[in-house]
Amino acid sequence: FWGSWCAPCRKDNPYLVKLHEEFNGRAFKDAKTFHIVSVALEMKPERWKAAIAKDGLKWPYHHADFKRMDSDIARLYGVREIPTKYLITPDGYIAGVNMSYEDLRKFLNERLAS
């Protein structure tokens, strides 16, 4: 969960880009691949689209909710602030919340298929 207007979110984006570049398309012991799904809690579609382009967010799964923190999906996941990152397993288990780049990278590397 992020927003184009959120400075800490924009600061995190280069790390997400690195994770996408490193793990996209790779097989894991317990998952077919790794996907990033970006949910933006936004005010203006133009700013959201511009931030995706400027930050180089090349993964295909982007969603914007213009109700921001009042959105159904933010409430469903208990988002109280952004950025908020969830690591969700293929069976829907939340394996991590707001993991650091280093911890997330370690978690993924440990699960790569040989």
Features from the language model and the residues they span:
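Short active-site neighborhood of thiol/selenol oxidoreductases, capturing the structured segment around
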Residues: 1-10, 16
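Catalytic core segments in nucleotide and nucleic-acid processing enzymes
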Residues: 11-16, 64, 70-73, 99
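Conserved helix-turn-beta segment immediately C-terminal to the redox Cys motif
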Residues: 11-39, 110-111
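Short, internal strand/loop/helix patches
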Residues: 49-83, 90
